[in-house]
Amino acid sequence: MQAPLPHNEGARVAALQAYRVLDTLPESTYDDLVQIASAICGTPTALISLVDTDRQWFKARVGLDSTETSRDVAFCAHAILNPSEVLTVPDATKDARFVENPLVAGDPGIRFYAGAPLVTPEGEGLGTLCVMDYVPRNLEPHQLLSLQALARQVMQHLEMRREIERTEDALMNVEGSLLEMEAYQRSLEQSHHELEVRTTTD
């Protein structure tokens, strides 16, 4: 079953784009967080998944070769519908939302999923830090809390990234303004020089 769109989909996608993280190269900061999530939850697979308009893209992953999947089969597309809660699916073959999902019915045969939403300060769900297994199971309360804490760490790093991007943009604008001022100054000096030449000639 394909997940419905969040009520704030337009603002959510705009917020995701503002972080400028889609299709970027792997970074050890995020790779470390999925390794920790996998270890704490005891799952073979952990992902940082960002839900774009028609796909989910993985900023970091362990236990999975793919870098993205179609949004219509994404468990995380369901998780972002309620950004304040972890979506837990103990056995996907017994959940009407996922039983016919090709990632469940076919390869890789997902059975268990838990996704902690990545939530902006404004409340938009960008994606999840999620863990998956290929046998039915569940997480202990302390594992769920740890998954949420790690998801907050992901968002803190994304926020820092966004602030750095904003600072760099501001610096580029300042540099552009300085170049324009320098060009204007040179133009004034040239005009002044030409005026002096004409005055001297006259």
Language-model regions, residue ranges each:
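Signal-transmission linkers at sensory-effector interfaces
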Residues: 1-28, 173, 187, 194-197
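Regulatory sensory and allosteric helical modules in signal-transduction proteins
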Residues: 14-15, 45, 51, 55-61, ...
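Helix-loop-beta substructure at the N-terminus of cytosolic sensory domains
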Residues: 23-56, 71-72
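Glycine-biased flexible loop/turn sites that connect beta-strands or occur in inter-domain linkers
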Residues: 48, 123-124
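A short, aliphatic-rich beta-strand micro-motif
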Residues: 111-122
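Short beta-strand-to-loop transition segments that serve as allosteric relay/switch motifs
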Residues: 128-137
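Allosteric cytosolic regulatory segments
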Residues: 148-155
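Amphipathic alpha-helical coiled-coil "transmission" helices that mediate dimerization
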Residues: 162-201
